[in-house]
Amino acid sequence: MWVRVARFEGGTAEGLETEMARSKQVLEELGSGGLPPGLEGVTRVMEAINRPEGTGLAVIFCDTEEDMRKADEALNNMSPPAEASGRRVSAGVYEVMHDKDMA
């Protein structure tokens, strides 16, 4: 399993809330209608925000390195979200070594 972690900084609490609502709607629509080119191999999306700091994370999961390479390329070519939700300051790809549900 592979993940891409993108970090966003410089957002406002209101801007982050707006972006998360928009993102949730887009993800729900994509889940029923297919993913954009390059993102077909994405198996899971997780987003997190820190309102007081104005930061956020987007974690994208793929099963294979090839699918992640395609997703990373597609995501790098997409426009970052609006200024109020922060700017992307980093994005990296990682191989998952351990994934254990502790519940």
Residue spans of the language-model regions?
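Short S/T/G/P-rich N-terminal loop/turn motif that feeds into the first structured element of a domain
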Residues: 1-57, 63-77, 83-103
